[in-house]
C-alpha cells in the first residue's frame, strides 16, 4: 500500500464570505514531487499555508506526515520545510548568520554541523560570509532552500520558489529537488512554468479555489484533448472562467 505524506479531504478557507479554497482534496505519496498549478489568486498559497500549520482551515480533515493537520499543527510545522514566495530571511545578516539563526529557532543541538551541511549541500560554503541582501535572485533561492532543509524536514512545501530566477538557476534548483525526492523527501511545489511542471511526478491544477485536474502531465494533456501542457491549462482556465466566473 502506498504511503501518503499528505492525505487531506475537504480543505476549505473563506475570507469575507468568499471561499478562496473550496473543499480541496489532496493526496501526495511519500517521495513524490507534485506540482501545484493555477492562476494567481486561485488558492495555492492559502492551501500550502494550511497544510503546513500556519493557517487554520475553516473545514477539512486528514493527516500530514501521519499527524492530524488541524489538531497537531505545531507538530506538523516542526517536520515541514516551507519556502515562501518572497525572500523571507534577514538581508542584513550573512548567509551563515541567517542559517545559524534558523537553527537556533529549532533548538538544534548539532547546530554548527547542520549549518555546515546545509552550506555544502547548496554550494554556499565559499559565500557564507556574504550578506544575504547582496545576493542575486538565484543565490537567495539557494539560501532559502538551505534554511528550509536545516531541521531535516520530511516534507517540503515550496511556493513559486523559482519566480524571477534565471534559467540556469532554475535548472540547478530542480536538479536539487529531484535529489531530495530520491532521498525520500516529499515535495509539493507551486509553479507557473510549464517546463517545471513537466519535471513533476504528478500535477494538481486549481482555479477559483477548486481542483480542476490532477494526474501526470501526459494524462492531463490527453484528458483535455490538448496539444501540450500549456494548451491543456489554457483550456482548463477557459472552462473555469465560464463556469465559476459566471457564478461569481
Language model regions located:
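Conserved ABC ATPase signature
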Residues: 92, 131-135
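Conserved ABC ATPase "signature" region
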Residues: 100, 104-127
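Conserved catalytic motifs of ABC-family nucleotide-binding domains
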Residues: 152
Amino acid at each position: 500500500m502506498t504511503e501518503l505524506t499528505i492525505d487531506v479531504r475537504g480543505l476549505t478557507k473563506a475570507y469575507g464570505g468568499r471561499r478562496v479554497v473550496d473543499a480541496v482534496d489532496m493526496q501526495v505519496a511519500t517521495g513524490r514531487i507534485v506540482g501545484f498549478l493555477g492562476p494567481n489568486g486561485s488558492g495555492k498559497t492559502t492551501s500550502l499555508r494550511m497544510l503546513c500549520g500556519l493557517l487554520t482551515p475553516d473545514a477539512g480533515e486528514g493527516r500530514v506526515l501521519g499527524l492530524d493537520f488541524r489538531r497537531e499543527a505545531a507538530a506538523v510545522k516542526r517536520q515541514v520545510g516551507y519556502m515562501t514566495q518572497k525572500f523571507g530571511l534577514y538581508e542584513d545578516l550573512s548567509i551563515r548568520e541567517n542559517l545559524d539563526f534558523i537553527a537556533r529557532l529549532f533548538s538544534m543541538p548539532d547546530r554548527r554541523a547542520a549549518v555546515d551541511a546545509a552550506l555544502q549541500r547548496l554550494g554556499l560554503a565559499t559565500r557564507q560570509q556574504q550578506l544575504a541582501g547582496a545576493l542575486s535572485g538565484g543565490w537567495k533561492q539557494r539560501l532559502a532552500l538551505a534554511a528550509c532543509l536545516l531541521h531535516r524536514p520530511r516534507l517540503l512545501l515550496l511556493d513559486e520558489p523559482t519566480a524571477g530566477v534565471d534559467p540556469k538557476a532554475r535548472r540547478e534548483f530542480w536538479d536539487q529537488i529531484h535529489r531530495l525526492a530520491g532521498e525520500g523527501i516529499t515535495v509539493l511545489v507551486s509553479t507557473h512554468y510549464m517546463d517545471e511542471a513537466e519535471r513533476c511526478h504528478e500535477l494538481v491544477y486549481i482555479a477559483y479555489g477548486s481542483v480542476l485536474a490532477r494526474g501526470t502531465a501526459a494524462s492531463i494533456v490527453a484528458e483535455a484533448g490538448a496539444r501540450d501542457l500549456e494548451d491543456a491549462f489554457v483550456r482548463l482556465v477557459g472552462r473555469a472562467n465560464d463556469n465559476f466566473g459566471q457564478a461569481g
